[in-house]
A protein has these predicted regions:
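Short, Lys/Arg-enriched N-terminal segments with co-localized hydrophobic residues
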Residues: 1-10
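Short acidic-hydrophobic, aromatic-tinged amphipathic segments that line or gate anion-handling sites
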Residues: 64-68
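Hydrophobic beta-strand scaffold residues
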Residues: 39, 104-105
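Conserved N-terminal Rossmann-fold NAD(P)-binding element of oxidoreductases
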Residues: 14-18
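Beta-loop-alpha module in the N-terminal Rossmann-like domain of NAD(P)-dependent dehydrogenases
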Residues: 70-71, 76-97, 110-114
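Rossmann-fold NAD(P)-binding glycine/threonine-rich loop
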Residues: 95-100, 107-126
């Protein structure tokens, strides 16, 4: 076994939702620069089809920006999605991601206590 093959197996696969926004672009850069993480995609309906790295202001990464969570769930399932979208969509998106067994890091404010409790329960079930 190649010595780096072991590392690739255990790298955390990360996708960024809201990857075209200010915070999302910073998360893309941070994930790209972390040797323990591998960036597998970005989601932003206004930047769909563009290279995730180019949108973030770094080199092209050969990773195409997706338009929606639904596109991702059927293709390139990450281990974790970091979400920097907005309160209008975060709750439904987080329910979809957690129900699909994807860990979620939410950087968006605006969830009610009841919504946070429900997301916690869904995450614990999956």
């Amino acid at each position: 076994m190649h010595p780096l093959a072991f590392l690739e197996v255990y790298m955390i696969r990360v996708m960024v939702n809201g990857a075209g926004g200010k915070m999302g672009r910073e998360v893309v850069k941070a994930v790209h620069n972390d040797p323990e993480l591998t960036l597998v995609g970005g989601i932003d309906p206004t930047k769909a089809g563009q290279d995730v790295g180019s949108v973030a202001g770094i080199e092209q990464l050969g990773i195409t920006m997706n338009a929606s969570i639904d596109e991702v769930l059927g293709t390139n399932k990450p281990d974790v999605i970091v979400d920097f979208t907005n309160p209008a969509v975060i709750y439904e998106n987080a329910k979809k991601m957690l129900s699909a067994g994807i860990h979620v890091v939410i950087g968006t404010t605006g969830l009610t206590a009841e919504q946070r409790d429900e997301l916690d329960a869904i995450g614990r079930q999956n």
